[in-house]
Design a protein with these regions (language model features):
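Conserved alpha/beta enzyme-core scaffold
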Residues: 1-269
Length: 269
């Protein structure tokens, strides 16, 4: 394969031919610690590109750069996501957008992309480690964020794919969540995220007594079911109660000597 490393986000945006009205996507695994979305949008704004459809896997309460500002200045005029938190969510509720916002579940979003209902012109995939050929992961590095699963469909289906990392490693990057065959360009920036904030917000560990009570009762229900047996599988999440429930469930698994075949979800946590 070819070396795909470019010198800056500006070079990448120009190389992919991003134009007014196109659709861009991101993943939200860096959660409140994300510093990629702001950098990319600032680059796009500086190049005078406007009226973009902003289609991330979800929007959390991003603190470093307000998405609201990019809507107000016309850089973004449409939003499609799987959920919107924080200042952008508040602004949408109070009439920020002229076009209705489209929200899909985490399962419906990949289906819409695969079916062509949501066509991604450019996917910017943040990675905690990547090599110059485009192999990328979120599992290692100072800003590890877990699986890059939210970006799989973007990598497979987007017209252009740019991997953004602050941790360039020797080829081959391993384990690779995103394979080089799906990547057009790689950009190294100074910083992609704040590791102290990746586990904040919805992905925080909870100490709230009510949350813990709900989590423990949910674990009790699972443990009392006929499905709680050797090689069972379960789906969890990155939410505070889900994390606590998984912890309680682990205690019950150890006590009864039960092992799961696999667990799905909650990768960021």
């Amino acid at each position: 394969g070819d070396n795909k490393l470019l010198g800056s986000l500006k070079e990448a945006v120009q190389a992919i031919g991003l134009k007014d009205g196109m659709t861009i996507s991101f993943h939200h695994s860096f959660r409140e610690g994300d510093e990629i979305i702001g950098q990319v949008l600032e680059t796009i704004r500086d190049l005078g590109i406007k009226h973009l459809r902003f289609a991330p896997s979800a929007v959390v309460n991003i603190k470093n750069s307000s998405i609201v500002d990019f809507v107000k200045d016309g850089t973004i005029d449409r939003i499609e996501a799987s959920g919107i938190r924080g200042s952008l969510g508040d602004a949408v509720l109070t009439g920020l957008m002229d076009e209705p916002v489209i929200l899909r579940t985490h399962g419906a979003r990949p289906r819409a992309i695969e079916a062509g209902e949501l066509e991604i012109d450019a996917a910017f995939i943040g990675a905690s480690a990547a090599d110059e050929y485009g192999n990328a992961t979120g599992q290692i590095g100072p800003n590890a964020c877990g699986s890059l699963g939210y970006s799989f469909i973007d990598a497979y289906c987007a017209s252009k794919v740019v991997v953004v990392t602050d941790n360039l490693v020797e080829y081959p990057c391993c384990p690779a969540s995103i394979s080089q065959q799906y990547v057009d360009y790689v950009v190294k920036v100074d910083r992609i995220g704040d590791p102290e904030k990746i586990g904040k917000g919805a992905a925080r560990m909870t100490k709230n007594p009510r949350d813990l009570m709900i989590a423990e009762r949910a674990a009790d229900v699972i443990a009392a079911s006929r499905m709680f047996k050797e090689n069972f599988s379960f789906q969890t999440g990155a939410g505070a109660i889900s994390i606590a429930c998984t912890n309680y469930l682990a205690e019950r698994m150890e006590k009864r000597g039960v092992k799961a075949s696999f667990a799905l979800g909650g990768m960021t946590a």
